[in-house]
């Protein structure tokens, strides 16, 4: 009976250790994916300038061409 109790305790410790290791791996994967930048952000950089879309000033557009509240590619 004593051996069975010890065996069950060892099994419980091993299972809890395995669960903790898997949880840490999941957190590491989440951190890895959260650090990645979207492809558009990698291509254009981290500025907020637009190629197309609405604007209020030339500085908001990539090509500094805000015409009638819209960025134009020229």
UniProtKB/Swiss-Prot annotation:
Keywords, in A-Z order: Disulfide bond, Ion channel impairing toxin, Knottin, Secreted, Signal, Toxin
Major subcellular location class: secreted
GO cellular component terms, A-Z: extracellular region
Organism lineage: Eukaryota, Metazoa, Spiralia, Lophotrochozoa, Mollusca
Domain comment as written in the entry: The presence of a 'disulfide through disulfide knot' structurally defines this protein as a knottin.
Annotated source species: Conus victoriae (Queen Victoria cone)
Tissue: Expressed by the venom duct.
Propiece residue ranges: 20-41
Protein name (record): Conotoxin Vc6.11
Function: Inhibits voltage-gated ion channels.
Compartment list: Secreted
Signal peptide: 1-19
An annotated Gene Ontology molecular function: toxin activity
Disulfide bonds: 55-66, 61-71
Pfam family, one: Conotoxin
Family recorded in the similarity comment: Belongs to the conotoxin O2 superfamily.
